[in-house]
A protein has these predicted regions:
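Membrane-embedded catalytic scaffold of the fatty acid hydroxylase/desaturase
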Residues: 1, 8-9, 13-167
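A membrane-cytosol interface segment of integral membrane proteins
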Residues: 165-191
Length: 191
């Protein structure tokens, strides 16, 4: 017999709606909420700042994470799997989409501004996410989304800024010179 314990079973969704709602729950808890919490809890921010310290945001930035951050995101994702009661196939689909969107969000590509604006009502676009990589507040604490942009709009964390005004990196001008071990030690350095 099948154990039904998640939100999807309570709502009795099947087929496409089940897949879509599962993806949305996984994205909300496993990406948006995890990302938001990493910005709000100082020890987690000290780990996440490794990602933000990149002064040249591109697709490599999407892969620039401290191993501790990967563990934190894993915990949130596992919780999201239980809440959504997602099948392994849906989890694989979500993880695949997450990787694609993370690369897309950090890519140095410029979409037609009208198309970008329309697209950003549904999904996170590079222009939208790059505001999040601005080195100064309040922009750093906006646009947390990974796949769906609805979360930032719904929770008031959406922000726009002209791309020419964005300065990448962190406000402390930390420069790791791409030294792998220096990057790994960054969360533990004394100020």
């Amino acid at each position: 017999s099948k154990n039904e314990f998640g939100l999807i079973s309570l709502l009795h969704f099947d087929g496409f709606l089940r897949v879509l709602l599962s993806l949305m729950i996984l994205d909300f808890i496993g990406a948006y909420l995890a990302h938001y919490v990493q910005h709000k809890i100082k020890p987690l921010w000290l780990v996440h700042v490794v990602h933000h310290s990149d002064r040249y945001v591109d697709t490599t930035t999407a892969n620039r994470h401290h191993p501790i951050e990967s563990f934190v995101r894993f915990i949130f994702t596992v919780f999201a799997v239980f809440v959504s009661e997602s099948s392994i196939a849906i989890v694989f689909l979500y993880q695949s989409l997450s990787v694609v969107f993370s690369q897309f969000n950090h890519a140095n590509i410029e979409l037609n501004s009208h198309f970008d604006k329309v697209m950003s009502y549904l999904v996170v676009t590079p222009r939208m996410h790059k505001v999040h990589h601005h080195s100064y507040m309040p922009y750093t604490d906006t646009n947390y989304g990974n796949i769906f942009s609805i979360w930032d709009r719904l929770f008031g964390t959406y922000s726009e800024l002209d791309k020419d005004k964005i300065i990448y990196g962190t406000d402390d001008n930390y420069d790791d010179k791409n030294d792998f071990f220096k990057v790994l030690k960054r969360p533990f350095k004394k100020d």
